[in-house]
Amino acid sequence: MQDRLFVSMEHPRALPETDLIKGAIVGAGAVGMAIAYSMLIQNTFDELVLVDIDRRKVEGEVMDLVHGIPFVEPSVVRAGTLADCRGVDVVVITAGARQREGETRLSLVQRNVEIFRGLIGEIMEHCPNAILLVVSNPVDVMTYVAMKLAGLPPSRVIGSGTVLDTARFRYLLAERLRVDPRSLHAYIIGEHGDSEVPVWSRANVAGAFLSEIEPAVGTPDDPAKMFEVFEHVKNAAYEIIERKGATSWAIGLATTQIVRAITRNQNRVLPVSVLMSGLHGIEEVCLAYPAVLNRQGIDRLVKFSLSPGEEEQLQRSARVMRQTLDGIQF
């Protein structure tokens, strides 16, 4: 059964079983600090180091955070450099150029590649045994770039993928159907961006598949107009950026869930960015795809069934990624 359900990843080593779990966040902007806050209140790490090129700012952010430690489980949070991150289990990378209003994620790519050139080498110098979690946009491209620059196996370089998109999808669908989002199972896969793919054929509530109840679900012919839900999901980041300048809180919560799945060895399935190696005929690009996460990093990929239309959309998303990768220098 497992052979038919999963594709195993190569993982030469797992995170060591230790009493203390240590992590680092590189980049103390809005996203990095939302992640740090979420991790602090969920007791994700015993020790957390925040790194940023603006040392005074990150020191101020840490001061603000640690004054709240009496209200949560005790942990150590400090500002530092990458040299202070030796021995960490997970490095979360949020550093990068900020997405401008109206700017697509893909237009960020070359600017962020230049930032990653020096950054990844320094991370590997000081944290060679850590799992890398890339949050910087465009996340699928930057995950691939980080993997190549780091020289690590694909199981140890993970992107935040469409974990947030999937959460938005479930939240908005659940709102329509008047159920708890945790009781609704649906995924968005592919690019974290404009070519992402809603998997309507697998969306279900307690095993009741929406596509069996309404075969036209997610299409313009759907009388319930569920396709509007996906349009809201796809445009959510642009709408938030227009109103407040950046997204932060939800990606902070999403990233914390990914890290907890890894460090707590949860074997949890989340749609993270992973190197595709033959699934659905896709090779040598990183896309968001349901993966089993534990202390190995990405342990296995789920062999996900798609409708013919969804399969074509995923192939198109892969082509978008391939074109972008072919056009950058790293």
UniProtKB/Swiss-Prot annotation:
One of its GO terms (biological process) is lactate metabolic process. It is an enzyme of class 1 (oxidoreductase). Substrate binds at Q99, R105, N137, P138, V139, D140, D165, T166, A167, R168, T247. It is found in: Cytoplasm. It catalyses: (S)-lactate + NAD(+) = pyruvate + NADH + H(+). This is L-lactate dehydrogenase. GO terms for molecular function: L-lactate dehydrogenase activity. Homotetramer. The modification Phosphotyrosine is found at Y238. Pathway: Fermentation; pyruvate fermentation to lactate; (S)-lactate from pyruvate: step 1/1. Its main location: cytoplasm. Keywords: Allosteric enzyme, Cytoplasm, NAD, Oxidoreductase, Phosphoprotein. It holds the Pfam family Ldh_1_C. It comes from Gloeobacter violaceus (strain ATCC 29082 / PCC 7421).
